[in-house]
Structures are given as structure tokens and as C-alpha cells.
Amino acid sequence: MSGNHNLDNTTFLPLVAAAAGTVLIAGVFSAAAVALDEEDGERATCQNIGIAAEVISSNLLDGRSKRHASNGSGGHGEKKPRRYVCWDRQRAKLCIMNDYLGSQPSFGPEDFKRVFRVSWRTYNQLRNYLCHVQPFFRPGFDATKREKVSTDAKLLIALKYLAYGTTVNAFRDYFQVGESTAMKCVKLFTKEITTSPFRQEYFRSMTQGDAKRVEALHTAVHGVRGMIGSLDCSHIVWGNCPVAHHGQYQGKEGKPTIVVEAMVDYTLYAWHAVFGYCGTLNDVTIWDNSLLLQAMCDGSFEDIDFPFNIGGEVFQQLWMLVDGIYPPLSRFVKPISVPLGETEALFSLWQESKRKDVERFFGVFKKKFNFFAKPVPFFLWRTF
């Protein structure tokens, strides 16, 4: 593949999770780091788009999407005739250019980023890459010599679906696209993003060079040496959970939930993530099955360690902030549940305030991309 079509390392950092078939399967992936500069917030936002893309694409493995081709009588009797809709594709193309992508658009870069969750720069890089590898996104003409749905409309449909989690029919009046075409846009977008050469770069484990950059960032921001992130879990309410799975996914929250585990740094970049654990599990049971624990046990985590000095004493193991439920490990710094004296009380306050990095990550993860609360539309209906 030509280097001209690769995405910039500093703008698109997809991170993945897994969910397959009608039973969500947890998958663990480590993401890569790049230079920590003023674009950290944009990179973290693009990571969440990558998460949504992988959740959808993994649900499309083997089988066909479930369809309901029936009339009001539940599928019996004569089917209603199909109605032809003449979509005004040119009008949609002009609207997109006039509103967002033209030389003098009605809405500027900030409005575009707020609506579609990515910047113009990232969008243009995505557009160039997808047009290069996927013919579906290239401009052209259909069998009737009419111009196809524009490239921008296809890409913006996918981005908007990931951001809002609503049905694709909600966008047809603006983009002038039918439901089947819109669904194909989402499927091919997520497929190309999650099966592209970016996997070798963005899904690799943290290196010692990455660890040194993140440790230096936390030293400057939090004022302490050796910290590489904060680890925690969070529950996402599964609004469309099938009734048959309620018992498996309904925990203390009283509603079916899906658990997300993540270890993130100050810039909200996730170095480790798990998406898809059942809501009946807690932080401890998830940690017992975590690949992050496996990396600590088999010694591979030691590859990123380097010596650092705290109070005149040299330490060798990098560490992360966790809450009190996690086990007492040398790499975990937990709050003091019953502080004795002013020093311990101040330490507990410091630990709880700095651990808010991972809480901020979960807040962005849930609020900016509503698709995660509604993963059912891409479940498969298998026929034999």
C-alpha cells in the first residue's frame, strides 16, 4: 500500500474491544503510544471510534444480519409491494458541502468535530485511506447512469451512527440514502478500520520508550515518578439486551450491563482495554481473568520497567493507581481506607483525585459514543 494513503500516527489511534454473535466475548487489546502533544484529546476521541468499529465488525463475523420481512400479520399472507424512492443524491451532496466540507461552509471545524466526533484533518485522512482500499467508498455511477451516493455521505453516515447509536433511518432525509445502503456504509467502514494495516501499529504492546514518555507526562502533571496510568472498571447499561441474557448480564445495578476495563493515562489514551464482560462480574473477578495480570505473572511486563528515584530511593517497577477493591500488588497504589494521621489522609486525597483520569475516560467513552449502549442491531440471525 502506498505511504500516501496511511493515516497520521498522531491523529488516528483506534483501540478495539470484542463482541461476537449473540453472546459478547471479552477481548483484550493493548494500544500504542505516540508523541504526547497538543493533539492528545483528538487522539483519545479517535480511539473511541475505533472501539465502536471493532464492536460492530466483530458482530458481523459468519452469518447474515437479522431481517424482518413481514407485514402487519406477522409474516403470513400477501406481502406489501415495495415502494420505489427516488433519492436526491445531488441535493444531499450539495448540503454536505455547503454545511461542512465546502470552501466556505456554514459550520466551522469545531461544529464538524462536535457533530461527527472527529476533526477535519482526521476525516480527510480516513477518506483518502478508505477510498484507496475499498471500492464501495469511491465515487462513480450506478447501472442507470446516475451518480452514486457521494463518498462523504457514506463516511459521515458511519461516523454519525457510531456517535449517536440511533437507527440509520434517522439520517436518510439529510443524506438521501436508503436503509440497506446506510447499513452497508457502517459495516464496510468498521471492517476496513479494524482489518487494516493499522493493527500492527496501534494494537501492539507498550514498549519501554512508550512507558518513558507516559511516565514523564505523569511526573509533570501529577508530580510523582513511576506512574503509567490508572486502572478501573465501569458498567455500561445494555438497553437492548435480549431477555434470555438478562440473568447473565444483570448485576448489582438492577439492569443488564456490559463491563469495560481500562488502564489509561492523563490524556485519556487507553493502554489496555476490555469490553464485553458480563454485568454480574465485579472488578476482582474481571482482574482474575485479565491479560494484564497474565503479563505481570509471566514477566513480560518487566520489559517496559526502568529505574526511577522517589525520595532518594531507587525503584524498578512502574505502577498504576487503582481503587481499594483490587488485590495488594507491588504495581498497584491503592488509597488508605483508614488513614492514621495527616500524612496518610493527604495521600488518600491525592490518590483519589489523580485516579480520576480513568473516570474521565469512562465518561467520555459513554457520553460521546452512544452506540455502546445499543449493540443489538448488528446481532446475527443464523439459518441452517
Mark where each language-model region is.
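Short, amphipathic alpha-helical "recognition" segments used to contact nucleic acids or chromatin
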Residues: 151-164
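Short basic-aromatic helix/loop recognition motifs at nucleic-acid
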Residues: 114-117, 143-149, 159, 275
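A structural signal for short hydrophobic/aromatic patches embedded in well-ordered alpha helices
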Residues: 125-126, 157, 214
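Short, well-ordered secondary-structure "scaffold" segments embedded in the functional core
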Residues: 2-9, 167-384
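Structural recognition of short helix-loop-helix hairpins that underlie histone-fold modules
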Residues: 127-143, 165-167, 366-376
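Short, conserved non-catalytic motifs in the polymerase core
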Residues: 139-149, 342-345
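Charged, often Cys/His-bearing segments associated with DNA-binding zinc-finger transcription factors
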Residues: 1-141, 197-198, 203
